[in-house]
Each structure stands twice: as structure tokens, then as C-alpha cells.
């Protein structure tokens, strides 16, 4: 297991915008934009019918099914390699404005004092996404998607990563904590909320359908922003209406990423809100820090007063029962100062009630701890040691 490589929290707020890919950034499934045409003569429906049928028959993950189907159908027809998948990716059509969206939004965030990071969380193929023009231009901080393992000739031989609608959510937690490596178990480590690199309130999730619902719900429940998009050519809003009705999304807009579009205006408004909100969050955590310091100081003061009261009570104890009760309370205190230890040593030598029962189990344990905390050897500590050893 790899060691945790956690990205440190920035000195400016980070807004992570996470995208599904198919029908969110692109009008169609990526496999239907080159690959299926090569092996199925363009019969897209048949490919998905057979793939989904195989998943149902073998109780198989649908993403594993399509990955198997892609490799199986390519055999003897086309040479399927990592390079050819990236080449298919280069043919994928993108919605209007996507080409310059990522850098334009980054620059807008920069003007507002907010660091913008773009992430892909998709059930599509990582290799095809990496072949798109936007990915090659460095649009994405990280691409989380299904992918193959390849042999030394670049031929896919086994699934390396499978991303389905439920395990998509893990990547949101990775982004939140800055632990981006998919094999880094540090994502499970505890961090105080103020140390999260990208708290959920600063996560935007943009998707189009049911497969995005777990991520949308998680973002919504934790104060983030979920956006449903629909194709502006068909104007079919049935999916986003359903998601809105079920409280899965806060907003919906056409998948139009051009400057001045509804989506552009909405995301910029979220950036503006993030800039203002993070000022308030910063003030909140400053107040929290001061409150914690004050609370700790108060606890220390109360603890010190309690210890002094117990020392005074022990010094004046006139019965064995009272002495045992006081010692019982003192055993609950973890730390004693040097001055307090010295007072307790004097009491053991001067108060006959205490001195007489030094060999009793609870009193003996307590005074051994006091001698250890005191850490000095002199006539007084030597005498205490003798009394502890000899039982008077």
C-alpha cells in the first residue's frame, strides 16, 4: 500500500468542479463516437443491448461488461490498443464552449481569489477521455474513470479500474482530503474539518443522469453544489426535472459551456459565493481556535484549583477513610507540577494519618507516581521510598 501523499491545504480557497463525461461534456456515449462504428457498422443500439444483456445474464457490473465487449468484439476486426483508444477519444464531440471552458473558468476564479480545479469522475474510459483535445491541453486536475491494464504492446488484457455509479463517491472524498492516488488508504484518515483541502461546500458536481445521483446527493447533503445538465438541442428536461424533484440537484441548465450561457453564469455565481463564504469560514475558524484556547486555559485553571484543594484536604486529613477518599480523587489527575509533588512529599512525612498508610495499595501507587514525577533524589524522597518498601 502506498504511503499517503496528501496535498496540503492552499492559502486560498479551492473550488473543485467535478464532471461526469458522457452526455455532460459530450452529447453521446464516447464508445459510440468511433469505436462502435468500427466494429458494429454503426449499430450503437445493438452493442449496448448485447453488453447489458451479458451483464444481466452473469450478474456482472455493466461497466465490466462493456469493457469486455469492447475487447472481444475488436478481436480479428481492429487492433485495439491504448493508442487507438486515445485516437477514438480525439474524435469525441464536445458540447458548445467546452473547448475553452476550463481555462476560462480557472481565470475567473483567479480574479476572485479562488483556485479552480477540474476533475472527471466518469464510468467512461479513461484512455478515451485522455485522448480528447481538452484533456491533452491539461484541462483536468485528475481523471477518475474506468481503464484497462495493457501488455508491453499496449493491448488491453484486464480491467485496471472500474468506476460505477456507487463507487464514484469515493473520489469526492479523495478530492476533499487532497489524497488523490486511487491506491492511497490515507483517504480514510481523520482530519479536522478545518484542515480539509476542499470541503464539500466547495465541491461542484455536474452530471446528467441517474448514474450521477449518489455523487449529487452526497455533495448536496454536505453543503456543496450539484448541477444537472440537459442537451440544448433536444431540450429534454425529464431527467433534470426528476432529479430536482428528488432533491438530487440544486440547479439545472443546458449543457452549453459558452461564455454568457446559463451554466457559465451559474458557475461564476458559485465562485463569487465561494470567495465570500470562505472569508466567513476563515473568521469562524479563527473564533473557534480562540475559543478552544480559552476553554483549555479555563480547564487548566479549574484543574489547578482542584489540585490545590485536594492537597489542602490531604494535609488536614484526620482519618484513614478521608485520606483514602482524597487519594482516590488524586489518582484521577494525570499531571502534577514539581512544586505540587514537593508539597505532597512533605504531607506524607508530616501527617501521621498519611504516613501510617503509605503501604496501602492505592496510597502506595499514588506516591510512587509522585516520586517519579518529582524526579529528584534527596533525603525526603529517600525516606518516602523506605516507608513504601517497609510498610512504615
Features from the language model and the residues they span:
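C-terminal accessory/interaction regions of large nucleic acid-associated machines
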Residues: 353, 363-367
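Low-complexity, intrinsically disordered regions enriched in charged/polar residues
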Residues: 30, 41, 54, 58-61, ...
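Long, low-complexity, intrinsically disordered N-terminal extensions of eukaryotic proteins, enriched
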Residues: 1-9, 14, 46-49, 312-315, ...
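Alpha-helical substrate-recognition element adjacent to the catalytic core
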Residues: 2-152, 243
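Long, compositionally biased charged/polar accessory segments in the mid-to-C-terminal portions
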Residues: 53, 346-347
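C-terminal cap/substrate-recognition subdomain and adjoining C-terminal extension
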Residues: 96-119, 123-339, 347, 355-356, ...
Amino acid at each position: 500500500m502506498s504511503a499517503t501523499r496528501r496535498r496540503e491545504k492552499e492559502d486560498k480557497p479551492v473550488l473543485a468542479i467535478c464532471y461526469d463525461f458522457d452526455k455532460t461534456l459530450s452529447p453521446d456515449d464516447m464508445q459510440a463516437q468511433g469505436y462502435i462504428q468500427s466494429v458494429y457498422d454503426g449499430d450503437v443500439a445493438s452493442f449496448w443491448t448485447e453488453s447489458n444483456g451479458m451483464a444481466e445474464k452473469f450478474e456482472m457490473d455493466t461497466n465490466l461488461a462493456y469493457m469486455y465487449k469492447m475487447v472481444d468484439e475488436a478481436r480479428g476486426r481492429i487492433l485495439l490498443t491504448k493508442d487507438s483508444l486515445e485516437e477514438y477519444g480525439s474524435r469525441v464531440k464536445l458540447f458548445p464552449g467546452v473547448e475553452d471552458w476550463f481555462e476560462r473558468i480557472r481565470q475567473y476564479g483567479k480574479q476572485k481569489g479562488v483556485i479552480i480545479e477540474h476533475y472527471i469522475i466518469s464510468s467512461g474510459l479513461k484512455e478515451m477521455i485522455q485522448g480528447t483535445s481538452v484533456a491533452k491541453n491539461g484541462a483536468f486536475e485528475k481523471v477518475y474513470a474506468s481503464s484497462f491494464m495493457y501488455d508491453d504492446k499496449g493491448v488491453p488484457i484486464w480491467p485496471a479500474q472500474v468506476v460505477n455509479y456507487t463507487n464514484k463517491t469515493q473520489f469526492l472524498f479523495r478530492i476533499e482530503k487532497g489524497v488523490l492516488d486511487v491506491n492511497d488508504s490515507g483517504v480514510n484518515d481523520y482530519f479536522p474539518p478545518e484542515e480539509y483541502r476542499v470541503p464539500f461546500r466547495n465541491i461542484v458536481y455536474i452530471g446528467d443522469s441517474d448514474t450521477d445521483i449518489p455523487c449529487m446527493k452526497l455533495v448536496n447533503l454536505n453543503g456543496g453544489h450539484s448541477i444537472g445538465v440537459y442537451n440544448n438541442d433536444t431540450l429534454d428536461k425529464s431527467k433534470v426535472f426528476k432529479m430536482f424533484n428528488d432533491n438530487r440537484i440544486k440547479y439545472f441548465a443546458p449543457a452549453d459551456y459558452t461564455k454568457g450561457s446559463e451554466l457559465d453564469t451559474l458557475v461564476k455565481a458559485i465562485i463569487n459565493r465561494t470567495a465570500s463564504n470562505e472569508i466567513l469560514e476563515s473568521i469562524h475558524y479563527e473564533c473557534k481556535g480562540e475559543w478552544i484556547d480559552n476553554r483549555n486555559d479555563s480547564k487548566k485553571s479549574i484543574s489547578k484549583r482542584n489540585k490545590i484543594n485536594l492537597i489542602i484536604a490531604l494535609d488536614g486529613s484526620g482519618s484513614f477513610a478521608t485520606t483514602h477518599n482524597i487519594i482516590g480523587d488524586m489518582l484521577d489527575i494525570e499531571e502534577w507540577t514539581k512544586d505540587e509533588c514537593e508539597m505532597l512529599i512533605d504531607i506524607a512525612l508530616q501527617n501521621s494519618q498519611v504516613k501510617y498508610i503509605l503501604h496501602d495499595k492505592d496510597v502506595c501507587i499514588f506516591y510512587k507516581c509522585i516520586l517519579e514525577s518529582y524526579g529528584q533524589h534527596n533525603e525526603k524522597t529517600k525516606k518516602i521510598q523506605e516507608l513504601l518498601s517497609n510498610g512504615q
